[in-house]
Curated annotation (Swiss-Prot):
It comes from Arabidopsis thaliana (Mouse-ear cress). It comes from the Eukaryota. Changing F266L: In strain: cv. Zu-0. CDD domains: F-box_AtFBW1-like. Residues 1-46 form the F-box domain. This is Putative F-box protein At1g12190. Changing N326I: In strain: cv. Bur-0 and cv. Wu-0.
Amino acid sequence: MACVKFPWELMEEILYRVPSLSLSRFKTVSKEWNTLLNDKTFIKKHLALVRPQFRLWTNSKVYSVDVSLNDDPNIELRELPLDIPYVIDHRTTNFLPCNDLLFCASWWSNKAVVWNPSLRQTRLIKSGEEHFRFGGIGYDSGRPGKGYHIFGHSHSRLSVNGNTSKFIKRFYITKFESNAWKCIDDVSLGENSIGGDSLDNNNVSLNGNLYWTTNSYDTDEYLIQSFDFSKEIFKIFCVLPRKKDSSDIPVLSVFRGDRLSVLHKFKGTNNMEIWVTKNKINESVKAVVWMMFMTVSIPIYKDSKPSYFINDIYEKRLVMCCSDENGKACVYIVKDQARKKIQLGFHVSEFSHCFYDPSLIPIPSETSGQKISNS
């Protein structure tokens, strides 16, 4: 049987639609294919067409959940290799997407891992501080090529007048290009809400900056705080639409790739509100305007935190990964008043999850001792 050779343009169009995990294996087909799959233009076009995913972790397995939003929405559940070094217990690990990489940090550990699941690349990050907690990853938006930075904080006891002491929270950053950590701020605990209780487990990365929710000690309002990696400063970004006395801890997500969304679940009910920012998030924004996107009633497990994304290209849809009222993993797809629940089919009572856009963007190569592993 004669071998049929496809036109190169047609081959590119096909490869744009191949899942990232499969594409990474095609780099060994030929030098021409390897050049194409590493090309920045190809990576950008592929990312624009990739289907959204959730990542789920148990203590023994990792799953990807591909979501297809056609006329009859469905999901595809796939088990992935569990090849993240130093991530032992998902219950004490935070997973933060940033520019299509995943930042995996265990609580009060001096180790974290930057991971690209599609390329099966990992990079270990270490801190020499005791009682250290990683807060997230971002980059200097003013630099070409995205100079990634890692952010975290430590707690220590400081003696005062020789006989009393107080706890000090110290914030640090390090650049990917080096192993050197720099202290950027000292804060006395109880005197300032910088960081807040949600810095480590309710943050998002957008345009290189970190955003997270906290609450004002004075007004009981929920706030979004941010850290600008290019200027190395904290600031109060905005006040959220709901107060602490009416809703559980709000859940942030990225909307349209350049805006923020927030999910408020009302205490003691299944009722939720999803709000989105009207304008793009950038330095020119002086006042943040929030718009109601959707109200919905979804029964989820008590005190559980959902992961979600919004799709409004053609119709308003909310896609949420969570534990249902019985503690079982599921995905809800909501459109107008229609709500579809899809059980994920594995039976574990505890798991972690996050929304993630898979991509072929490689982890920046080492320059000073930080090693990249290709599993």
